[in-house]
Regions:
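Hydrophobic single-pass membrane-insertion segments
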Residues: 17-28
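C-terminal active-site subregion of NodB/CE4 polysaccharide deacetylases
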Residues: 30-124, 129-137, 142-145, 209-335
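Substrate-binding clefts and substrate-entry loops adjacent to catalytic sites
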Residues: 198-209
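Generic enzyme active-site microenvironment
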Residues: 124, 171, 198
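Acidic (Asp/Glu)-rich catalytic clusters
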Residues: 58-60, 114, 154-165, 179-198, ...
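A short alpha/beta connector and helix-capping loop motif
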Residues: 134-159, 168-170
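Positively charged n-region of N-terminal signal peptides that target proteins for export
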Residues: 1-4
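Hydrophobic membrane-insertion alpha-helices, especially the h-region
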Residues: 6-18
């Protein structure tokens, strides 16, 4: 359970660690003598004292969180396509603005650690196109990650700016990332790198044009495909195809088909604003907004988030919820 800290009421100025029953230096316990031929007694090292986390005076863990939506990563900018150059610039911009990449489910489950004073940002990728994750072959025929695909660019950015982090949530369709001979290897590789796999359904249907059972069947078909590569992988999030939910939204949340069950914690929309923090009263995990990654929308919303009390800023402690007292009424009430 998280502890709550209201900044205006109890900003901690100093932390003192008191060690009880510790003998003075001159009275340190000598190493016991042992009979000849006996192994020496190894004294345990003294326990480490963890350094206290820095106090982040502007921490706001009820602030808004940008969840960015990408589709194709290609040479030229276009509709539903981000150019390779612009994607690189997006990551540089996010780093310089103080953001750290987190996987969707890790952050909203409270498992992602955002460094103190930095802000979380979730990158999502729909449609599992080849430009998101591509293999190339060297002269010896060995595979390597294309440095101009999304995964390659993310790895390069992380090497340049470790505080940016390495994360991303990829919403898969059937036959993900092209290169059909490598798709299973790619899914396992992505999980090994720490990325999150989400569902975008197998065939990307219009949910409002098919039956509930057809929806369940399509979701399960994608899940079974993922299990071929990563057995038992729990898909936590589903991006609604075309941003259209079923008439009964819960049909896409959990269910089963032919004895195979699925259970999603998060449903992703197509637009169109920053998301609410996990502990905000308006956070709705079954309708998570995203920001399309275009020059206009990124500039507009990232500038907006720089306004007072708008942006999530981490205190660095996952066990404590810190926020300005002006937002006291915005905290989600726990039952």
């Amino acid at each position: 359970m998280k502890k709550y800290i209201v900044l205006a009421l109890c900003l901690m100025l100093a932390i003192t660690v008191v060690m009880h029953n510790r003998p003075p230096q001159e009275a340190a316990t000598p190493t016991p003598e042992v009979p000849s031929g006996e192994p020496p007694v190894v004294m345990p090292d003294p326990p480490e004292v963890n350094e206290p986390l820095p106090v982040v005076e502007n921490a706001n863990e009820l602030g808004r969180v940008p969840i960015l939506m990408y589709h194709r990563i290609v040479a030229e900018e276009g509709e539903w396509a981000r150019s390779i150059e612009n994607f690189r610039n997006d990551l540089k911009n996010l780093y310089e603005r103080g953001y750290t990449l987190v996987n969707l489910s890790d952050f909203y489950d409270g498992k992602a650690q955002v460094p103190p004073g930095r802000s979380p940002v979730v990158l999502t990728f729909d449609d599992s196109t080849r430009g998101q994750f591509n293999y190339l072959l060297d002269a010896a025929g060995e595979k390597y990650i294309d440095p101009d695909c999304a995964v390659g660019i993310l790895l390069d950015a992380y090497a340049r700016w470790p505080e940016l982090g390495l994360a991303g949530t990829f919403f898969l369709n059937g036959n993900p990332f092209g290169q059909s001979e490598y798709w299973q290897e790619k899914l396992k590789h992505m999980v090994d790198l720490g990325f999150e796999l989400g569902s975008h359904t197998f065939s990307h249907p219009f949910f409002n044009r098919i039956t509930d059972e057809e929806i369940r069947a399509d979701i399960v078909k994608l899940q079974l495909q993922v299990w071929q590569a990563v057995p038992g992988y729990h898909i936590r999030a589903l991006a609604l195809p075309y941003g259209i939910a079923p008439r009964d939204r819960t049909v896409a949340v959990s269910g089963s088909h032919d004895g195979v069950s699925f259970n999603h914690s998060y449903l992703m929309e197509v637009g169109a604003e920053p998301a609410f923090a996990p502990d905000h009263v308006r956070h709705n995990p079954l309708s998570m907004p995203r920001i399309a990654a275009t020059d206009e929308l990124l500039s507009r919303w990232l500038d907006w988030l720089d306004g007072p009390l708008r942006r999530y800023i981490s205190d660095g402690n996952p066990d404590v919820l810190t926020y300005p007292d002006e937002l006291q009424e915005q905290i989600k009430k726990t039952p």
